[in-house]
Swiss-Prot record:
Cofactor: Mg(2+); Mn(2+)
Residues holding Mg(2+) 3: 461, 469
Cofactor note: Binds 3 Mg(2+) or Mn(2+) ions per subunit.
UniProt organism field: Humulus lupulus (European hop)
Protein name: Alpha-humulene synthase
Catalytic activity: (2E,6E)-farnesyl diphosphate = alpha-humulene + diphosphate
Annotated metabolic or biological route of this protein: Sesquiterpene biosynthesis; Secondary metabolite biosynthesis; terpenoid biosynthesis
Amino acid sequence: MSTQILASSSQNEKIHKILRPTKKFQPPVWGERFLHYNISEQELRYKQQQVEELKEVVKKEIFGESAYDVSHQLKLINVVERLGLSYHFESEIENELESIYNKSVGQNYILKDENLHDASLRFRLLRQHGFRVSSPDIFEKFKDEDGNFKECLVSDTIGLLSLYEASHLSCVGENILDEALAFTTTHLTEFLANKKEHDDPLSREISQALERPLRKSLERLAARHFISIYENETSHNKVLLQLAKLDFNLLQSIHKKELSEISRWWKESDFVLKFPFARERIVELYLWILGAYYEPQYSMARNVLTKIIAFASLADDIYDEYGTFEELELLTEAVERWDIYIIDKLNPEYLQTFYKELLNSYEEFEQELPKEETYRVHYAKERFKELLRSYLEEAWWLKEERVPSFDEYLKISLISCGYHMLIVSSLIGMKSSIVTKEVFEWLSMDRKIIRASSTICRFMDDLAEHKFEQEKNDEPTAVECYMKQYGVSEEEAYDELNKQIANAWKEINEELLKPTGVASPILVRVLNFSKFMDLFYKNGDSYTQVGKVAKDSVAALLIDPIP
């Protein structure tokens, strides 16, 4: 909140003039590129039919044969998942993995001849699907008498890569996986350093993994990357590859059509003219939500949640950049009451505009739902109210030029990051029997998995923007608050926050193991929101300053089809 009020006297009359910020955010880089995209229903149906036909072939070829050994079947499942096709074969994959789990873990059957790659792959796939497998039981045999990973493993590059990926499924206190991560990172980095060319498939995989392991990668981006690698493997399955390409391009067409509709909503609402001080990032916001769920059946959910996150972004800029504290108090109170008849109490006009658009949109969400599901919107409203209360608290810190303690900061900032609001709101448009009132009640509590995802969101945002925030003299970040409470240097604060981010990932992994508090397809949204933070905030704030990461991601998922 950078608004100031200047007072001057003239003929015994005090005149107050509000100085609004003159700084403007980077303009949108996409223009109206997505506004006019269209694809006929006939063309979509044709593409869907092609995908359905190939799906049946794949079912028979891969999941219809029960004679394969465990190693072979795990590798097939891995390829299917990495090609982005797992959502087509959820029950088949789950059945196969449950069978493998019962054979190799549930009945204490030890695969003594299992190599490092196979053991790591088995562990990773089972953990990804919520099976509670013991890391020491699987990986202790790869250690020497001194408790270190055997030196002979250094030459097994494929095994090292597989172990590296598996280590990112660790839970709190799994020391053997922490050691595995350090061991594999060191030797995979050395492998690349000793190679003059990095164009071969293995080197490309290692480079990608070191930048972003599979556990932290958005599924569609990872699929796009792997399809090109898999195509260059001499032993690739042609039917699988063909299905992966067709499916990717089909989903891209569906997503582009959705983005076109969202872009028209943004343009017709005239938000750019009504809120010229705010970031115009509707394409990036849609990408954010696409990261949470890409499957075709969640089209309505994406539409609803993109609009909600757009309002959250507008509110963020109102509270951070534009409004006076008195205006922010008025808006917070009005949203708390959620009553269109009090709109006249909001001044200046931009507050009325925001309030009216917000309430009208949530009313439209209710109208789009069956009557028995309209209760969902109530839970989303409550989280949005909570979000604005946290924004107001942070605005007060800035107004008072106050740096809170780290503990006090966390109470507010883990709400103001917006992830609790988004996670609850993400269920509004999900057409699924697993979304019930009990699920909303469960998610509305302070759950460990939501707190962990919010921690990743808040700390990665703060670390990415710390220098920028300091130059703007904006509200304090986790860095200043940690330094203040614990009397440490900036570098020490950075190290501690990064440790807490790593620990939060482990907590998410643990919360996704069976039995879960609510159905896994719901909790996966929490995981996916965390993945997006790693993409957009690992090397800076790619939302506010749209650069290569954002541009490449949008191009890969929403512009360029796979040939």
